[in-house]
Structures are given as structure tokens and as C-alpha cells.
């Protein structure tokens, strides 16, 4: 169920303060955050935000198409290594 429009988008205060401070100083430095739940708002356009995926911070460059999405959507937490391959299928064939 989506969030009510009258409430507005959720953005952690500490993240929004960092973005606003960089906008005032006209800086574009990487901002580290653990807040995967924050919604991307127009003030973040052009910034690179390093979103934590549980192991490391993944840099995400924010553009116009990302507005309204969550930061966690762009930092995958699981790695897919493929299904187990048959041991005999790669090398030699069975006789």
C-alpha cells in the first residue's frame, strides 16, 4: 500500500540536512548514508549518495528519473551467482 499523499515523502532529517548544506555551498561530494528507506526528492538531483547494502556503500548518482523512488532500490543487498552447474556438463561427456 503506497504512502498517503497528505503525509508527503519520507526522507531522514540528517540526510536532507547534508544535501541542503551541500546545495548552499554548491558542493558535490559523496554523502554516505545507511538510510535505504528515504525517498529521493528533487533537492538530491546531481548528488552522489553512497547507500549501504549491508556490506559496503554503493555510490548512486541521482538523476531526474529517480525522483519518488527509495534509495534502497538502487543498492542491491543480494548477489546472484547462478544456479549450480552440472559437474559433468562442462568438461567431458559420460560414456
Swiss-Prot record:
Annotated segments matching region Disordered: 73-95
Transmembrane segments: none
GO terms of molecular function: rRNA binding; structural constituent of ribosome
Gene Ontology, cellular component aspect: cytoplasm; small ribosomal subunit
A Pfam family matched in the record: Ribosomal_S19
Record SUPFAM superfamilies: Ribosomal protein S19
Signal peptide: none
Record keywords, A-Z: Ribonucleoprotein, Ribosomal protein, RNA-binding, rRNA-binding
Entry-linked InterPro entries: Ribosomal_uS19, Ribosomal_uS19_bac-type, Ribosomal_uS19_CS, Ribosomal_uS19_SF
GO biological process, one term: ribosomal small subunit assembly
Function: Protein S19 forms a complex with S13 that binds strongly to the 16S ribosomal RNA.
Family per similarity comment: Belongs to the universal ribosomal protein uS19 family.
PANTHER family linked: RIBOSOMAL PROTEIN S19P FAMILY MEMBER, SMALL RIBOSOMAL SUBUNIT PROTEIN US19M
Protein name, entry field: Small ribosomal subunit protein uS19
Amino acid at each position: 500500500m503506497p504512502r498517503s499523499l497528505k503525509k508527503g515523502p519520507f526522507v531522514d532529517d540528517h540526510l536532507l540536512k547534508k544535501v541542503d548544506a551541500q546545495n548552499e555551498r554548491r558542493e558535490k561530494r559523496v554523502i554516505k548514508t545507511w538510510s535505504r528507506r528515504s525517498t529521493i526528492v528533487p533537492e538530491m538531483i546531481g548528488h552522489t549518495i553512497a547507500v549501504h547494502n549491508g556490506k559496503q556503500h554503493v555510490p548512486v548518482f541521482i538523476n531526474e528519473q529517480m525522483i519518488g523512488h527509495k534509495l534502497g532500490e538502487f543498492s542491491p543487498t543480494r548477489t546472484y551467482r547462478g544456479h549450480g552447474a552440472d559437474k559433468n556438463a562442462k568438461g567431458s561427456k559420460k560414456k
